[in-house]
Amino acid sequence: MSKKRLYEIAKELGKESKEVVARAKELGLDVKSHSSSVEEAVAAKIAASFKPAAAPKVEAKPAAPKVSAEKKAEKSEPAKPAVAKEEAKPAEPVAPKTEKVAAKPQSRNFKAEREARAKEQAERRKQNKGNNRDQQQNGNRQKNDGRNGGKQGQSNRDNRRFNDQAKKEQGQQKRRNERRQQEDKRSNQVAPRIDFKARAAALKAEQNAEYARSSEERFKQYQAAKEALAQANKRKEPEEIFEEAAKLAEQAQQVQAVVEVVPEKKEPAVDTRRKKQARPDKNRDDYDHEEDGPRKQQKNRSSQNQVRNQKNSNWNNNKKNKKGNNKNNRNQTPKPVTERKFHELPTEFEYTDGMTVAEIAKRIKREPAEIVKKLFMMGVMATQNQSLDGETIELLMVDYGIEAKQKVEVDNADIERFFVEDGYLNEDELVERPPVVTIMGHVDHGKTTLLDTLRNSRVATGEAGGITQHIGAYQIVENGKKITFLDTPGHAAFTSMRARGASVTDITILVVAADDGVMPQTIEAINHSKAANVPIIVAINKIDKPGANPERVIGELAEHGVMSTAWGGDSEFVEISAKFNQNIEELLETVLLVAEIQELKADPTVRAIGTVIEARLDKGKGAVATLLVQQGTLNVQDPIVVGNTFGRVRAMTNDLGRRVKVAGPSTPVSITGLNEAPMAGDHFAVYEDEKSARAAGEERAKRALMKQRQATQRVSLENLFDTLKAGELKSVNVIIKADVQGSVEALSASLQKIDVEGVKVTIVHSAVGAINESDVTLAEASNAFIVGFNVRPTPQARQQAEADDVEIRLHSIIYKVIEEMEEAMKGMLDPEFEEKVIGEAVIRETFKVSKVGTIGGFMVINGKVARDSKVRVIRDGVVIYDGELASLKHYKDDVKEVTNGREGGLMIDGYNDIKMDDVIEAYVMEEIKR
């Protein structure tokens, strides 16, 4: 026997596969899915179980759609003919429904009930589909009969129209049934609606009744009061009535007078359109609390608003009628003009120059027109926007009887005020500070050697020509107390630098050589110290040398006003030997003793102020300034104004080269972070924030520029002859470049002091840093030559100078520059030698050998390095050392020269501080042929 699958049975019956699977399981068959197969007998049994729910196929003759009554009957009851035909046809035997009920378990099974309800709904849907299918079959039979009967065209159109109409009516009936079901469900879920119109009408009627009742009560009260007053007046005599009437008239006149004098206060406009008259006897309607839930309360509030809107709906119309051509409104008297309130004049008036009339009027609470009138009476024509000077303002205040005081404005850009103001320091916060000691003296009298001995280092050995080139600041500790030392150059060219040192110092150590005595710079140092009112400690140095005569030194100093305490003076004398460290402890004890007598105090709690000791431009760091903190505490990231520039302290290093974050009073530090390099000797001050510091710095730079422009000499009748005479003079143009600002100032001042008849020196440009291309271009344009002091030209600048034939003079000792300039200007030049650079090398590695020194491994990058040539050590464009080679080797062999591109090793005579990336410049001196 053949088998059938369940989905094939479902397809034949027009059922879904899951329904057929469920029916098979109910019949006790072991099936798993719609793909399971069963015997034909079992398939017939499954099909028979669906027969009662399926719609029977009935052949019906096509009805003629001509009669309108039949169509109406079909529209009203479309399912009745099908039911009648089903009853007429004998049904096939099926299993009774009681079997299904008997198959259910006795206990209630909700899952089975849901499945049963789902099956019933599915059967009803199938039944409706069967009815539709029968109608379609009837329509198809009618079409066939029509074709066979010879009425093909008209019958087809009529049948099609009839079927479409039947489908449309069935769909409409179905939608109506669904809509009724949805409305029934919604009516069961939604609460009964409130009839707002009826509610509003009831509320309005209630309010009207309440208003009528209250109006009637007020009318009754008014009538009762009127009758009581009439009875009281009947009891009084006529004379008393007349007296009371007269009193009332007088009171009315007094009230009218007060109303005329006192202006009526204008109340702010308030919209009273929806406000009702208060009725204390009316009870609050609590109908909105009768129902629970926020939705009920919200609906009740909306009904209240509807009632209120209905009551006030005619408000705009009434308002328009009131604003119409009403004669009463036009005839109303205008309100009295309010008078200006009287303000008392101030007793004092603080003014500033340039105040306008309007500003003065606002301050003294008067009209500008009144002040303009007074000024006109005083003979001053002014408007309210015109500025007045201080004298005019004082005269105006005298006319008003006010005491005028000029307001003292604080200049934010003036940093000098911090050094002179008495209230800047807190007297309660003053603490003892280290003394600042300046070492002064003549050239080669041992100042730097003394300082070197104090610091236990050997920086004095490397000074070019034995002269300190710029100020150094250092700190030492003696007996647990700090002492700050400033070292100043001793040459005459550095007068301004010594003057700066004397202005910031507390004690001066005057170094005088015992074998040399008092020299010109010694006398100058004495004058600087006396001008600054600084005590002097005389250190008679070099007592170990033969021919030393300390007594002669004491006598010479006494002639210049420096008396020893042994001779009845106030200056301490100490005989020392800086070279052999003799009596150094005694000198330091004397310094601490003098400092203790002076009682040096400082306030570390205020913002830092102080002086610039030195400033320079560094290739990698930018502007670097050496500062001496005099008051307060300097911190990293402080906004600072230094001279005519400003910035923020980015990094701070002490005299040992170590990074620090805080610098107290009398502490020398080197800072970075400034926009430009300041001038040595400038004051600095820390501001509250960067904004105020920027404003102060820009204002100071602007003022300095204006001052420089105003200092430009103008031609006048007095200097006309001098100007014409100067035109006959020959001028020597010079461009000065140096390593530090102090050296630039010293060179400029020294060269301008050279007095040669018929020749003068003009400083075209002076700056800090290496010689660059712009300097060469400027020298070519101005026909000048360049003087470099402890700096070197860049390779590009050197090439450009050779191409443009610009002369560059490089020096490391200042008095040699001055002597050379004087000889050149006098035309007495001796045969001279010209420096010729023969090669350059770069240090790649260093090797320290005991008892020998430091060996530098180098590579020649340009030219050659010869054994008999002189060398310079250049670091970041600055000459560190200038000397001769002690050894030159290629591997282990001594060589006379190392050419370009080759490597070798060298040692420099007297210099061991060679570092990687140092540039070794080799040069020879060649005689210039004239």
UniProtKB/Swiss-Prot annotation:
Residues 577-579 are annotated as: G5. Residues 432-599 form the tr-type G domain. Residues 487-490 are annotated as: G3. One of the essential components for the initiation of protein synthesis. Protects formylmethionyl-tRNA from spontaneous hydrolysis and promotes its binding to the 30S ribosomal subunits. Also involved in the hydrolysis of GTP during the formation of the 70S ribosomal complex. Residues 466-470 are annotated as: G2. One of its GO terms (molecular function) is translation initiation factor activity. Residues 541-544 are annotated as: G4. Residues 441-448 are annotated as: G1. Keywords: Cytoplasm, GTP-binding, Initiation factor, Nucleotide-binding, Protein biosynthesis. One of its GO terms (cellular component) is cytosol. Pfam families: EF-G_D2, GTP_EFTU, IF-2, IF2_N. It comes from the Bacteria. Residues 50-67, 129-141, 309-318 have a biased composition (Low complexity). GTP binds at residues 441-448, 487-491, 541-544. Residues 68-90, 110-125, 157-172, 262-295, 337-346 have a biased composition (Basic and acidic residues). It is found in: Cytoplasm. The gene is infB. Belongs to the TRAFAC class translation factor GTPase superfamily. Classic translation factor GTPase family. IF-2 subfamily. InterPro entries: EF-G-like_DII (IPR053905), IF2_II (IPR044145), IF2_N (IPR006847), P-loop_NTPase (IPR027417), Small_GTP-bd (IPR005225), T_Tr_GTP-bd_dom (IPR000795), TF_IF2_bacterial-like (IPR000178), TIF_IF2 (IPR015760). This is Translation initiation factor IF-2. The keyword ATP-binding does not apply. Residues 50-196, 260-346 are annotated as: Disordered.
